[in-house]
A protein has these predicted regions:
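Generic hydrophobic secondary-structure signal
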Residues: 63, 80, 123-128, 144-146, ...
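Short beta-strand edge/turn micro-motifs at domain boundaries
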Residues: 147-188
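Surface-exposed, polar/charged interaction patches used for macromolecular assembly or partner binding
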Residues: 7, 112, 117-122, 181-183, ...
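Surface-exposed, charged secondary-structure patches
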Residues: 92-150
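Large, modular interaction/toxin scaffolds in secreted and membrane-associated proteins
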Residues: 4-11, 68, 123-124, 135
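Core segments of small alpha/beta cavity-forming domains
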Residues: 20-111
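Glycine- and small hydrophobic-rich membrane-insertion segments that are intrinsically disordered
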Residues: 2-28
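Context-gated lysine
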Residues: 6-8, 25, 54, 70, ...
Length: 189
């Protein structure tokens, strides 16, 4: 093994050890208001994208923006995805998830949102992001979980770290899956 290979191996082991040492970690992010433009999002302290937790929290905000304005939400999501913007299939998927008035979906990840209050979050807006023992299993990626007011288990979201600057970007999100029907839309409520 060459010196370079040893250095590379040591660096990789350090990243894996750091990721796995996260274990069960929980971070809460509080926002006075939801950003209404990419510039407003980029002005937030979390926009440094220096931890996967920050990027995950901003992803929820971007999805909330998408529910209100697809163009602004797309801008935000593309920025959070770094060098890998949304493709046509991914945009079609997003549009499908918000169909039939399901614009409440991303708000289920904001504290205070429940089916009984039609997923109306409390203010200030708080988003919790969690890691567990499997979060850092894949080098350069971090699988995190966001508790959902409309489901029993937190939903996964995956980030990827860019090697050149250490920033974390959105890789995959599984946040727009089915949740309990909001009370106003439930004929049996």
């Amino acid at each position: 093994m060459s010196i370079f290979d040893k250095l590379k191996s040591t660096a990789g082991q350090a990243v894996n050890a750091a990721a796995q040492s996260l274990g069960s970690k929980r971070e809460r992010f509080t926002f006075a208001a939801l950003p209404e433009s990419l510039a407003e999002m980029q002005a937030l302290p979390e926009a440094s994208l220096d931890t996967p937790f920050k990027t995950a929290a901003l992803t929820v905000l971007a999805l909330c923006a998408y529910a209100a304005d697809k163009s602004i939400g797309t801008e935000m999501l593309n920025w959070l995805r770094g060098p890998r913007p949304l493709n046509g299939q991914e945009i079609s998927f997003l549009n499908d998830r918000f169909r039939d008035g399901k614009t409440y979906l991303p708000f289920t990840y904001v504290a205070g949102s429940t089916p009984d209050n039609n997923y109306t979050p409390t203010q200030p807006y708080t988003i919790t992001v969690e890691s567990n023992h499997v979060s850092g299993e894949e080098q350069g990626y971090m699988k995190l979980f966001i508790p959902c007011g409309g489901a029993d288990d937190p939903r996964p979201i995956k980030m990827r770290q860019r090697g050149s600057d250490g920033k974390w970007f959105l890789w995959e999100q599984y946040l727009l899956t089915g949740v309990r029907t909001p009370k106003a839309a439930d004929p049996w409520a």
